[in-house]
Amino acid sequence: MFEIPRRPVGLAAIALVVVGLVAAGCGSSSSSGGGGQKIALLLPENKTARYETQDKPLFEKQIKADCPKCSVIYSNANQDPAKQQAQAEAALTQGAKVLVLDAVDAASADVIVKRANAQKVPVLAYDRLIPNANIDAYVSFDNERVGKLQATALTQKLKSSGTAAPTITMINGAPTDNNAALFKKGALSVFNTSGVKIGKQFDTPDWSPDKAQTEMQQAITALGNNGFQGVYAANDGTAGGAIAAMTSAGIQPSTRPTTGQDAELAAVQRILAGQQFMTVYKAVKLEAPAAATIAVALSKGQKPPTPPINGTTNNGKKNVPSTILTPVAVTKSNINSTIVKDGFWTASQICTGAYASACKAAGIA
């Protein structure tokens, strides 16, 4: 079983760390400023909007701040494990001094890690832990807690509506994604002790919204329109698919509270419109810079710096130096104090024509 550090660092603490590291540059090391190392950032897919709009630019910005002469070799695998392997090989051939790997799946990631190990190139597992692999660092969120936040919010919402023993549909993430297993584990730890019945449950290949829509259609066929009271969707993409299926079946999404994750713009707007109940906000503005700072150190042959490292995570092979951040549950009531306050999305981005009145009602301006 994978161990999570006991005290994940909160958002404010990591923010202070990153600011301090930028101000200090590369510290007192004789290689301060960097010598033009190449750092590979290998992201898994682009169906989840955050990777291209948040992770990539924030990572590149922090690399430039910490190591002006360093360059980033960027690749996105579009959910194709073979493609990610080829991209990793290409990065190594180009002379990458560290791989920052957000793995498509564990099996292909293990091959990449072994290849990097053979060339003495360190690997930082980004966002998704790579089980049983000889990785050098890990940066992510407390992923079991993500599932617990989702399940707790959904359970409380259903029970506050007068449903003592609700039935739900679970639309989980990709079976090849280690994080998806952790989200599910966290969620089930709540559902199994709360009197919630799981009417239908699915694992969603590739985190595909289209496949999630098909799964939800199957659940509606099996359970009936009135046979479930809520939907656990592991992220905002799968939530969108589930909501589309309910709408097509003549079910008002507002009557079936649906969870999500990633605070995607479309999801935030759905929450304001009452179509989606909640999402989980993960401050990528802290995660990506922390990974960049650690990657610069690894590229120079240095140990992962503490901070931003705040503990270790056992991946089944070793205790991996880790930065674990704290996720935040977001409903309509705290969009303004979390997502907007942090600048993840601006009010002008969220409050387009159709959502202007809902924004005003929620105090977003």
Which residues make up each language-model segment?
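A residue-level marker of the well-folded mature domains of exported/periplasmic proteins
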Residues: 2-8, 26-365
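Sec-dependent signal peptide hydrophobic core
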Residues: 9-18
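C-terminal motif of bacterial Sec signal peptides marking the signal peptidase cleavage site
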Residues: 20-25
